[in-house]
Amino acid sequence: MADKSTEVEKAIDPIIDLGNLLFIDREPIQGDASEGLEERARKNTQLLFNNIWQLEQKRVEEAIIVTLPPATYRLPREKRLPEKKEPTKWEKYAAEKGIEKRKKDKKVFDEATKEWKPTYGYRRGNDDTKDWLIEIPDNAEDPNKDFFAERREKKKERVAKNDMQRMKNLARQMKTTVKSGPSTEKMIGVGVDAKEKSKQQVRFAVDRAKLATASAGKFQEGLKGEKANVKTGKKRKFEANEAPVSGEKERALQILQRMKSKKAKIVEEKAAAVAGPLREKKEKSERKGAKDQTRQKSQIHRQQWFKNKVDGKKKGTGGAGKKGANKAKARKG
């Protein structure tokens, strides 16, 4: 395959931004866009590299590099540029004294094993923490004390001191980076403000924070006088499929005992709702029975009245006959 020429000519000058390695081809596409697209991309890339190699060059360890000029196009960013952090206390001191950070070797020669080992970390060389013997210095105040424990305590103090310095540096940086602006205490989607939460909400928040550990709060130490964690839910435990008969009998007896000991709970609202229609029905039936009873009595009275009237008529007719007969007898006499 023959080498292609590095000379590229364009009818319309392209826009080249070497700072962003941006190449904009302004020539219009004629005909089918898919045809000759690879050739066009090759020429544009070649022209971009031709402009790059026209910059100032220098050699660094068998490699030729160039320094790109400032960008002409300002590319949009999702977030603003990070601000320069406040130097730490040690960085300020090192700058004043002219102390430069020296790069330490990753490996060190271990005199005990005569091998090269990592300077730090696991199986590091010249590890004094694994010494089985510590030489007592001549100026020791108490030669009988535990020098191994003293070395461990000193290491703990150094770690605590470094951690304290780190926290101070973070606090110093926060004072410089935090800007005054609108209050961010009430943010959308965050929930209720901490000052406006109720006692129960705060308690639940504390319990959730305690459970948000690798051990689900099992090894979380509590404060003095702090209440126990609120159990918002219990894990359901199932009984074994095969269990002895004695245990089943005891469980059945316990259930029966609980049922006997429990008193029936009467809900007044439900009882009134159930008893209301029954009471109305009973009163209605009583009123109807009273009406029937009154009506029955009146009927009996009416029947008795008619019967007495009929009997009275019969008695009256018989008496008049007797009186007439008596009168006739008296006249004859």
From Swiss-Prot:
Pfam families: RRS1. Residues 278-295 have a biased composition (Basic and acidic residues). Its main location: nucleus. Residues 227-248, 271-333 are annotated as: Disordered. It is found in: Nucleus, Nucleolus. GO terms for biological process: endonucleolytic cleavage in ITS1 to separate SSU-rRNA from 5.8S rRNA and LSU-rRNA from tricistronic rRNA transcript (SSU-rRNA, 5.8S rRNA, LSU-rRNA); ribosomal large subunit assembly; ribosomal large subunit biogenesis. InterPro entries: Ribosom_reg. Residues 324-333 have a biased composition (Basic residues). GO terms for cellular component: nucleolus; preribosome, large subunit precursor. Keywords: Nucleus, Ribosome biogenesis. The keyword Endoplasmic reticulum does not apply. PANTHER family: RIBOSOME BIOGENESIS REGULATORY PROTEIN (PTHR17602), RIBOSOME BIOGENESIS REGULATORY PROTEIN HOMOLOG (PTHR17602:SF4). Involved in ribosomal large subunit assembly. Belongs to the RRS1 family. This is Ribosome biogenesis regulatory protein homolog. It comes from Caenorhabditis elegans.
